């Protein structure tokens, strides 16, 4: 085995990648990049019954979205391909048959009916379910419906050093004679992962904690096949806020769902890195470069990580605020075009959106929130109750007088920019013996149709002279029609 660090992310396309799965990919990627090694993607598509169309594409889309580039794998190739297990079946059958020939595995002819009945009886006796080794010493040959099982050593222990958990020991007698080759000729995970990790010269296996009980099986296979095993590190579970296993009842679990909800890839990389790893007890925001520099297995926790949705939203808001206006605009447009009011306005373009984004950038936590905060800056189809133009401390006529005075002052401006507008409207409030907030509130409703909106004068500048004055004129007309 080479001294080079070679790690793999080996998802099964039996569903769309969830956050725990992608967290595993990211820790492998960070470990490879930190050590100057290789990150390999291998698609473990041997479970044909549970195979989901589109799952592979979703896996690769998730990796690409997060910027987790791979050195070998689908779309890249490499010296150790193919990188789909369904294209490597001959290797697994070869290994399984060698183990049978050497007396380390055997054909099992037990029917599914017998196995089901045996399992039911074991459960009824409150025994741990497992194969009773009926065919272990029968020297059976291959036949239709037969599987190949591995002969577990019936004595002794299997001990290994987990790079996160330290020394771990399992009693061999408590292990099952597990299936390594199914009746359809496809391998189980246990055999395929061992054969491929050896063939692809994987140096370290970083995987979810749920695979820890399988490790003795894999180490026995390595020994039986005469392979040198990689080093193992089992990553902590991710739990929901209620400390139960993270699931759909806590919220979205698919990585693509977070993309569609308007989370940034930078946020997700940062946030997922902190689910089980910490640089210190206070730093929470890391650039990709810093994560690569700081990441090490010594700082990965043994205990489960808690998924904090509030923290994710906070972090996403922080990252949104670091974006330049053009960058935010380009990311915002796919979300804004889903809003019919904005899409129909004819103003959804990059240049205009670049002007709009700074108005609301400080107020959002997700890109999906943008449209509701700015649709009225795009669309002229704004509606409101004209009575809302009347300040609560003024009469209708006093409010109308104030709006007319503001319109005249704005119409006379040489430069229709935020600074000029405020320089002329703020003193006008004093002249009218109003508080600035009273006059600003009437202008906000008149120009946007909203009681709460982005900064007033900056919004009016983006709307432009013609649209802004047109809206205020319309407000004056609507207010005039109300009874005094």
UniProtKB/Swiss-Prot annotation:
Motif ('KMSKS' region): 245-249
Motif ('HIGH' region): 11-21
Species this chain originates from: Dehalococcoides mccartyi (strain ATCC BAA-2266 / KCTC 15142 / 195)
Family membership noted in the UniProt record: Belongs to the class-I aminoacyl-tRNA synthetase family. Glutamate--tRNA ligase type 1 subfamily.
Domain of life: Bacteria
Keyword check for Zinc: yes
UniProt key word ATP-binding: yes
GO CC terms of this entry: cytosol
Protein name: Glutamate--tRNA ligase
Pfam families named in the record: Anticodon_2 (PF19269), tRNA-synt_1c (PF00749)
GO molecular function, one term: zinc ion binding
């Amino acid at each position: 085995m080479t001294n080079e660090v070679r790690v793999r992310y080996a998802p099964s396309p039996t569903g769309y990648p969830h956050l725990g799965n992608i967290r595993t990919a990211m820790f492998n990627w960070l470990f490879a990049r930190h050590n100057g090694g290789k990150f390999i993607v291998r698609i473990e598509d041997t479970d044909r019954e549970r195979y989901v169309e589109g799952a592979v594409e979703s896996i690769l889309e998730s990796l690409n979205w997060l910027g987790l580039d791979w050195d070998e794998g689908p779309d890249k190739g490499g010296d150790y391909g193919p990188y789909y297990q369904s294209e490597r079946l001959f290797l697994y059958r070869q290994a399984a048959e060698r183990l049978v020939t050497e007396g380390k595995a055997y054909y099992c002819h037990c029917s599914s009916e017998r196995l089901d009945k045996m399992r039911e009886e074991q459960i009824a006796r409150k025994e741990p379910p497992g194969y009773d080794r009926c065919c272990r010493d029968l020297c059976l040959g291959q036949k239709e419906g037969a599987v190949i099982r591995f002969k577990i050593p019936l004595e002794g222990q299997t001990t290994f050093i987990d790079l996160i958990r330290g020394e771990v020991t399992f009693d061999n007698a408590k292990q099952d004679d597990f299936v390594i080759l199914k009746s359809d000729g496809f391998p189980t995970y246990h055999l395929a992962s061992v054969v491929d990790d050896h063939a692809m010269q994987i140096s370290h296996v970083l995987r979810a904690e749920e695979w820890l009980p399988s490790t003795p099986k894999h180490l026995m296979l390595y020994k039986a096949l005469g392979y040198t095993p990689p080093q193992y590190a089992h990553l902590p579970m991710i739990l929901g806020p209620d400390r139960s296993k993270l699931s759909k009842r806590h919220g979205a679990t698919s990585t693509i769902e977070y993309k569609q909800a308007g989370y940034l890839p930078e946020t997700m990389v940062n946030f997922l890195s902190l689910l089980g790893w910490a640089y210190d007890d206070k730093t929470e925001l890391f650039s990709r470069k810093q994560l690569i520099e700081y990441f090490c297995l010594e700082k990965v926790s043994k205990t489960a990580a808690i998924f904090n949705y509030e923290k994710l939203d906070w972090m996403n808001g922080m990252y949104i605020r670091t974006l330049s206006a053009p960058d935010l605009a380009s990311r915002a447009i796919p979300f804004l075009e889903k809003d019919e009011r904005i899409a129909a306005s004819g103003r959804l373009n990059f240049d205009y959106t670049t002007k709009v984004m700074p108005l609301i950038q400080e107020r959002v936590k997700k890109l999906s929130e943008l449209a509701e905060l700015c649709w009225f800056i795009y669309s002229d189809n704004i509606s409101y109750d004209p009575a809302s133009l009347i300040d609560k401390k003024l009469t209708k006529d006093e409010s109308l007088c104030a709006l007319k005075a503001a319109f005249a002052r704005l119409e006379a401006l040489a430069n229709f920019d935020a600074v000029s507008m405020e320089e002329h409207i703020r003193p006008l409030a004093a002249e009218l013996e109003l508080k600035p907030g009273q006059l600003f509130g009437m202008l906000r409703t008149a120009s946007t149709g909203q009681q709460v909106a982005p900064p007033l004068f900056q919004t009016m500048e983006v709307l432009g002279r013609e649209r802004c004055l047109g809206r205020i004129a319309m407000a004056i007309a609507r207010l005039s029609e109300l009874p005094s």
